[in-house]
């Protein structure tokens, strides 16, 4: 149903003369991301919940071997999405939210800027491995200090690995009034 609806929406907009790119923001369901990549010009995925739901706390400790197995599971699921994006010239936004880091990342790095960066870099490395570079990045946190620190760390890590991608930084839950404007 989602597939036919998205296809119909895309076709209807194009038939009406609209050429604004469609962007899908997908959480918790990699299958939906696959379908969205067929009809949207850009799909946002969240590393914290792309394969597994974020913060389930079902597993609190990961050995190095278990950590590597989880990364392999992510890669195995991400490759079909990458291929769909390549075939359809669909861009990807890797959108990392401080509030939705995976249990695996939180176990290894804590609830830190380093965890945000690790989460993003894992996905960037997979995209690079499969020669897909139509990627933009967003880093978001409700804490401006965490967000700024995360972005600076991410830029440093990307530079170390020879990566350059457009980067959006955002403050979630900015609020209203003067506090919201300052954030």
Q: Predicted regions: what is each one?
A:
Residues 32-37, 74-92, 156:
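Short amphipathic alpha-helices and their capping/turn segments at secondary-structure boundaries
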Residues 6-17, 82-86, 151, 155-159:
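Surface-exposed amphipathic alpha-helices with a cationic face
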Residues 5-8, 32-38, 54-57, 97, ...:
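Short acidic, glycine/serine/threonine-rich loops at helix termini
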Residues 16-17, 40-77, 104-115:
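Glycine-rich tight-turn/loop motif centered on a GG-T
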Residues 20-26, 43-45, 92-96, 135-139, ...:
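Hydrophobic faces of well-ordered beta-strands that scaffold small-molecule active sites
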Residues 64-74, 106-183:
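Catalytic alpha/beta core domains of metabolic enzymes, predominantly
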